[in-house]
């Protein structure tokens, strides 16, 4: 799916079971498509810290991200602070990373281009 259209324009689909867990080769293909994100927890999650000028900007980002998570039915773990938000994606149902994590990471990155 992500090979045909940009990740930020793709949609999440339900993924359950270890057969949907991405292997190292696929992770290496997808990671360059989401600059600023890094593999964490031994390659089991994606994370990125987004920095903002103040709490209002941080919360605007978090609220917009909540809408994306709701629409895609794929929810991140968040650490929310005055001037930053730490975003972590992983697919618990596959025991690691799935394409849904990369799709949502790309959509999350795109938010920073749209918010003040």
Swiss-Prot record:
One GO biological process term is: tetrahydrobiopterin biosynthetic process
Entry's transmembrane regions? none
Q: Which superkingdom heads the taxonomic lineage of this protein's source?
A: Bacteria
Q: Which UniProt keywords apply?
A: Lyase
Q: Which reaction does it catalyse?
A: (4aS,6R)-4a-hydroxy-L-erythro-5,6,7,8-tetrahydrobiopterin = (6R)-L-erythro-6,7-dihydrobiopterin + H2O
| One GO MF term | 4-alpha-hydroxytetrahydrobiopterin dehydratase activity
Q: Give EC number(s), comma-separated.
A: 4.2.1.96
Record InterPro entries: PCD_sf, Pterin_deHydtase
Q: Which SUPFAM superfamilies match?
A: PCD-like
Pfam families named among the record's database cross-references: Pterin_4a
Q: Which family does it belong to?
A: Belongs to the pterin-4-alpha-carbinolamine dehydratase family.
Return the protein name: Putative pterin-4-alpha-carbinolamine dehydratase
Which species is listed as the source?
Stenotrophomonas maltophilia (strain K279a)
| Biological classification of the source | Bacteria, Pseudomonadati, Pseudomonadota, Gammaproteobacteria, Lysobacterales
């Amino acid at each position: 799916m992500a090979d045909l259209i940009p990740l930020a324009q793709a949609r999440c689909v339900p993924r359950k079971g270890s057969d949907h867990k991405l292997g190292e080769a696929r992770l290496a293909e997808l990671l360059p498509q989401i600059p600023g994100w890094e593999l964490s927890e031994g390659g089991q999650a994606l994370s990125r810290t987004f920095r903002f000028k103040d709490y209002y900007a941080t919360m605007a980002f978090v609220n917009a991200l909540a809408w994306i998570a709701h629409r895609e039915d794929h929810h991140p773990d968040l650490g929310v602070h005055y001037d930053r938000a730490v975003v972590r994606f992983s697919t618990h149902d596959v025991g690691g990373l799935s394409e849904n994590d990369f799709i949502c990471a790309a959509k999350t990155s795109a938010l920073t281009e749209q918010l003040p």
